[in-house]
Amino acid sequence: MCEYLSAVYEDVVKRNPGEPEFHQAVLEVLESLEPVLERHPEYKERGIIPMLLEPERIIKFRVPWLDDEGKIQVNRGFRVQFNSAIGPYKGGLRFHPSVYEGIIKFLGFEQIFKNSLTGLPIGGGKGGSDFDPKGKSDGEIMRFCQSYMTELYKYIGKDEDVPAGDIGVGAREIGYLYGQYKRITGLYEGVLTGKGIPYGGSLGRKQATGWGLCYFTDAMLRDRGLSFEGRTVVISGSGNVAIYAAEKAMSLGAKVVAMSDSNGYIHDPEGIDLATVKEIKEGKRGRISEYIKTRKNAEYTEGCRGIWSIPCDIALPCATQNEIDGESARALVKNGVTAVAEGANMPSTPEAIEVFLSAGVLFAPAKAANAGGVATSALEMTQNSQRLSWTLDEVDQKLHTIMTNIYENASRAAKEYGNDGNLVIGANIAGFIKVADAMMAQGAV
C-alpha cells in the first residue's frame, strides 16, 4: 500500500479506536485502490477517500421498552447514514447483543460498495441495536420495535433512508417497525423493505440473498468452464441466506451436505433434506440439532468451526463475520475446495482470504456475492414507488441479470487494473469508482 493510503488508514484507526471490524473493512478497500490512484490522481487531490471513510451522519439513541414482567429495559439504537452520493441510504437493521457503533460502521461502509455494484441508485447505510430477540416473547419484540421506530422515524424516508432486515430482524420485526412508522407519520410509503406481501413487500425478497449468491457463484464458475452440477457444497448458517442458497444450489445440481446454527452443525453425507431444515428453523424456530431426530445417517456436532473441515467442492459461509479463519481456510484448501463465495458480511478473515487466493481458489467477496438482497430491496422500492407488484419470475429474472452484471463488472475491473481473477480487488475498485465519480461531480461541501 502506498504512503498516502497508509497514512489515510492510520488516521482511520486513530479516529475510530476500538473498532476492529471497521478497521478491517477499510483496510481491505484501501489495499485495492493504489492502481486506481495512479490512474486517477484527481481522487487524491480532491480528498475523496478521506471523505468516503467518514459517515455523513451517525445517529445513536436509547431504546426503552417494557418487558413481560412490567419492567423497563433499555437498549442502544444506532443508524449510520454513511454515503448518499448515488442515492438514498440503504441498508439493514441488525438486532443482536454484539451490536455496537463499530460493527454498524463496518456494515454501513461495506454497504456503500455493495449497493454501488448493483448498478441501482442506492447509497450506503446500516442500523441496529444491541437488543437480543432470542428468548423474547412476541409482545416484547413488538414493544421493542415500536420504541426503536419512535426514535428512528425522524431520520428515515422513502427518498432519504430506507432500512431493511438483517440478523435478528425478519418479516415479523419489519412488520412491527413499519406499523409504528405508519402510525406516527400517517404515511403509507416504501420506507422499509422486506415487508410482507400484503402491505407492499416484493416476491422473492426472502430468497434474494441466497439465490443471488448462487447466481454470482454460478457466473464465476462458468467463466472457468465449471458449474454447480454434481458438486458437494457446505453452507454455514440456517437463516434466510443459508436456506435459500441451499435451495438454489440444489436446483443447479449440487448436493448440500452440511449446515449450521449458532450452537453447532449438521453433516448429512446423503444430502441435506431442506424441507426438514425449513420446518425446524422457519416453522418451529428451533435448533438445527433437531435435524438428526428424523435423519438417522446425519451427525450433529456442537460448535461451528468444525463445519469447514468437511470435504467439499464449494463453500458458502452464510452465518456471520470472521467465521472462517486461516486454520479453517487451510482445512478447506487441503480438502480440495474449488470455490468459496461469501453469503454473510465479511465472513472470512484477511488471513483466510490470503490462503484462498494463494491456493488459486475461486473467491467471491461478500460485497459482490451477497448483493442480491439489497438489489431486490431496491426492486421493492421501485414497485412501491410505481404502486405495482411484479411476479416472482419477473423479480428472479432481474435478480439473475443484476448478479451476473456484478460478476462481470468486478471481473472486468480486476483485469483492467492488473489483478485478473482477483474479485476482492475488482469489486472494491468497481464499487469505489462509481461512488467517487458521483462525489466529485457533486462537490465536497
Model-derived features: positions:
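N-terminal ligand-binding/catalytic initiation module
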Residues: M1-L203, K434-G443
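Predominant activation on well-ordered alpha-helical scaffold segments within soluble catalytic domains
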Residues: Y9-E10, L27, E34, E101, ...
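Rossmann-like adenosine-cofactor binding region
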Residues: G264-F363, A368
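Adenosine-phosphate binding glycine-rich loop
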Residues: C2-A25, M220, A331-V445
